[in-house]
Amino acid sequence: MRMSRRETMQFSATALAGLSLASLEAEPLAAQGAPQPDGLVETKLRQISTLPLNPDGSAVEYTPQEAGAITGVLWRTKNKTPEGEYDVRKMKIKVDGRGTATLSGTLTFDVLEKLPRHSYVVRLQCGAPNPRGTVKWTGVRFSDFAQAVGAQSFANYCRLVGSDAYFIDEDMTTLMHPQVVLAWQLNDAPIPPEHGAPLRLIVPFRYGARSLKAITEIQFTATSFAPPKPWPT
């Protein structure tokens, strides 16, 4: 993987921004529901786990022999795996180009199956100690998918929504990195439901909250997205 100095600086900046924000987006702010202080007060810092990265901000890659299991599971539906279609060959994912891609509609596996397949052994690490694990992901690069649906240069951002209504908004510079994949295999087997079947976004140089599980919708935009829906209760 080779990147120009300019690309490296741009990517490293966006990666670090995502690392610092991941813990905030992964759970409601601790201050919500508490009385609002009249001024700024000292608060306790969260202990964040270490995420192994290369000097250029990309994820450290491991050998196939180092692949193992993921310990721990996290869902927004009271930590219960949402019901849904877990078979990647039967999946139907909504794609909305919002005027920034030439194709919109329903993404099915036959579209992904025609794209080059890639595998990476990388660390999945939550901001907390768990979930975590060094595992092998197999799928297609997000950049190849974006090209397949005709995402234009002015498609600056992407929103991905999971089956538990959790979502991430990500800049396209990050998603076009060659390590970012739409994966349907974990350690050479279909991703199990608890870890994000049928299709999961893998952003290995960000904390695990950014690797969205069980994708149900993908949107592109040039500017901004509508306000999110409330979390399921």
Specify the residue positions occupied by each region the protein language model found.
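Structured, non-membrane catalytic/scaffold regions adjacent to prosthetic-group chemistry
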Residues: 29-233
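Basic (Lys/Arg-enriched) interaction patch that binds polyanionic ligands
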Residues: 24
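N-terminal secretory signal peptides and thylakoid transit peptides that target proteins
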Residues: 1-19
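Cleavable N-terminal signal peptides
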Residues: 18, 28-29
